Amino acid sequence: MVKPVRKAVLPVAGIGTRFLPVTKAVPKELLPIVDVPAIQINVEECVSSGLRDLIMVTSRGKDALIDYFDHAGELEDLLERKGKQAELAMVRRLNDLAQISAVRQPETRGLGHAVLCARAAVGGEPFAVLLGDDLFEGNPPGIKQLLDVYAKYGKGVVGLWEVPVGQEHLYGIVDGEPVGGDVFRLNKLVEKPEPGKAPSRLAIAGRYVLPPEIFPILANTQPGRGGEIQLTDALATLCASDGLYGVRLRGERFDAGDRAGYVLAVLRYALRRSDIGAAVRAGAEKLLRET
């Protein structure tokens, strides 16, 4: 019987150099997608997929991420006194959205090391990992698509998306065999292959469901590209020793860790809003005509 997945790890310790100078004072995960930060979108993806026990891997200067989901007594009292019930309900909803805890990554040593920092909090059970730079809109949600594959095969699963031709060297790329629909049994993973040497165009998409066996593998993984412990290197070892699956995610993906991708994400989410969508569309079309 496959053990159910109850926990999710959200690595949020990155400095956010691509968004300087704003990230000098504000964690990049709190940059708004209209009026909701990217981290909330990922937390809600977890919750809507049945994951309410969430572990954030933070670093120095990232306490605001935990504060965002914590009770804000003075703010709530103020909103109540002013009769702003809609805003009060919005704030209180954040308090009860999920059970969120934090562990520290004491130094920047890569994504693999960030996941390893959550080892004690996760314990000996399978868990999900969501990268905050990758935003997904899908039905079912992105991580739920992985959970369904994990429940069927009982092996680690990575989310996949098809990258444009010529951009394979920018991503972790997989080689695999289709086993039905959008699911693949993976043969190997390559972190940012040299141009022209990628085994496919299927890239790892910032969503993972992993068995606890990944932790000892991570602990023994030597620093790779950039002197960091790469999660992809550990996944390659897991793939060879225990097997690994991939699922091509159905839905829309935005790379909110890139300036252009971030702006596109804001625009897309704004266009879908019933309160501002029409005005944003009209304004954007006017700007395009004038540019």
Indicate residue ranges for each PLM-predicted region.
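Residues at the starts of beta-strands that form the adenosine-phosphate
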Residues: K7, R52-L54, Q99, P126, ...
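Catalytic-core segments of class I nucleotidyltransferases/pyrophosphorylases
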Residues: A128, L147-A151, P178-A282
